[in-house]
Structure formats: structure tokens, C-alpha cells
Amino acid sequence: AWAVGIGNTHLAQMKQGWLESPILYMALIGRPGANKSHPLSFAMKPFLDYDYEQNKLFEEQYSKFEEKMCMSRKERIENGEDGFPQEPVRKRFLVSDVTPEGLSYIHAQNKRGLCLWTDELSAWFKNFNRYNNGSEEQFWLSIFSAKTTISDRRSSKSSIFIKRPYISVIGTIQKKILSELAKGERSSNGFIDRILFVMPNLQQKARWSDRELPDNIERDWQAIIQHLIDMECQINEQQEIEPHVLSFTEEAKARLYEWQHHFSEQCDNETNDTIVSIYCKLEIYIIRFCLIIQLARWTCGECDKEAIDLLSVERAIRLTEYFKNSAISVQNILNENMLTAQQQAIVNHLPATFTTAQAHDVAKENDMKSRTLERFLNDNIGVLFRKEKHGEYSKINS
């Protein structure tokens, strides 16, 4: 919600020419009945309320526009109206089921930015090939990096040109559908690595409770997000948003560089290319987190927004570590879904930490040959298992 409120109004500058938008692709994971949708609806309600009011205003304006268009130009001028009335624009933050072409059209009218909000995220990626094979997926890969998009509409001779797009994505997904997300090229072209997964440890079905949120919680949240919504945007001569660019303080940048160097060492020691790819995307996300956290603190009156400070970086590091662990958990779920019954039985029977000898004993009990076991262990280092030292392993998802 913070990121959507910021949109294209602010950017983080890591180095000269390296700017990051607060674009997030996020999935809330849980079993059916795990209460995934309600917290998301609560967080996005201020935008939903804004869009509702703007839609009512648009309908009123469009009705008047149609009345004017039914007049002749002479009649419009005689009535004190503009000879060529401008068609009204519907202001909004949220979109749902929409094609890239339709999304580009809406974005051109709402240059501050949009959020694709879908209750079931599976509907988003299952539609990627419904029109042009693979083109929608490429569209979202480009949007993630805020690359200029050009949409040539079939019904118009003109093109929609969006210099710096901002579209975040958020929705819920069930654990059993995660494997659908990794189908096709999405696991190899880095698409799935761009998604931030929120997966609570507690996956039980929510129990009904008489407890109510304090009255001030919703009111305060509405006021906080409304502060972002009401934030003035600077518009340049080309009618494009001129974002406020935040650089880092010297101590904040030094801490971020220190973290990145340590993170790079983890990548160097990681044998699984999929995990390395996830780590690389998190290096982009941490800069975006820094921007979002700084603006969140500014909105609440805790700091200024002249530059991103050390406290925002420290909090962004903690947030990145959370998403790193969540991504690894998701990869483990995906890998377990692809295991044979024999392989799954071996994983289930292995203790949290084990030796090669123990693994051979478990393999023997499940009719797996020694050479097959060794290949299974080696192929899944960094995926299912971690090699602690020679002859000793641990299970990653334990």
C-alpha cells in the first residue's frame, strides 16, 4: 500500500543514472481459509474508497460531456461552453482483470501509477498467453524494471507511450497452486524471481473471534494513506510527472554497500543458480524498500525526505532477509512438488541434520541405490539440502 501511494512521485538514486521505482510484485501465500484476503483488503481500502469516489465524479462529468457533444459547436459557444470539450478522465489507483493494451491506456491517464490487485493471483499469470503467445509475460518483465512501454492500439493510429511506467502487483495464492506459477519459461526467465512471497508460519484456518480492532486503527491507516494520495506531484512541460529523487546519506550508503558485499559472498558460495537469481532480484528490491520505508516514516512525521538515512537502510535489510527466507521456502515447496514418491519419502525420513552414512541407510530402506542417492544429494545442494562440511548435511526447509 505504501508503494502504491508513492508511485512515480519519488525515486531512489543509488548512483548517477541508477534510479529505482517502488515497484513491487507480491504474493500472499496460504491454505484455503488461512485469512489471506482480509488483511490485504484492509490495507488497500483507502485506494478502493478513493477510486469509488473518483468513479462517481467521472460518471457525472462524462454525462455532462455527452450532453455537450450532442450540441453543435455554435450551441456550445452560445452557452458559454468550450467549442471543443475535453473528454473527462477517470482517476484511479487500482485495476483488476485487464489486458496490457487496456492497462497502458489506463496508465496513460493515470501517470502517477497503478496497482494490479487480484484476489487470486493465479488468474493473473494464467492469462499470460491468452492473446499473443508470451507477449504479456514480457510486458510484465519490462514493467518491473520501469522500462518505457509503447502500446500500438489496433483501433487507433496513435500509440500510447509511457516513459516511466509504474504498476505494482499484489494478490493471494494457495500453496497447492504455486507449481502453476513456475510452469513454462517463468522459472527460467527470472519472472518468478521478481515476486515477493509472504508466507506466514501459521497456516491454520482462521478461528472466529469476538475481538474487534480498535476504532482508531482503520481511521489512522486511512489518514496515513490519504496523506500519500493527496501528495502534490510536480508536472513538467511535457505533462510528465517530475519525480523527487532521494539519494542516500553517506552512512546509509556505506551500510548498504557492506550488506551487498556480504550478500554477494553468499551468492558466490551458492551452488543453485535459481537461488542466485533470486538473490540478484533482492539486491534491486532492497533499494526499493529503502525508498518505501523512508517515505513511510516521513508520512508519519518521523523523518524528512531529503535523503534515505541509515535507519531506513537497516529496516530494509531486515525486510530483505525476510523475503529471502520466504523465497527459499517457496523454492523448497516447488522442488518437493516435483519429487518422485521415492525421493519424497527419503526427504521425509531424513533428520534435520544428517551424515552421508545416515542418508545411505534411509535410501536403503526406500530401495534407492547408493549411486542414485549421491546424485540426488548433489543435485539438490542449495535446493533441499545444505552441505555443512564433508559428509555432513542439513535440510534447508526444517
Language-model region placement:
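Phosphate-handling catalytic cores of nucleic-acid transaction enzymes
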Residues: 1-398
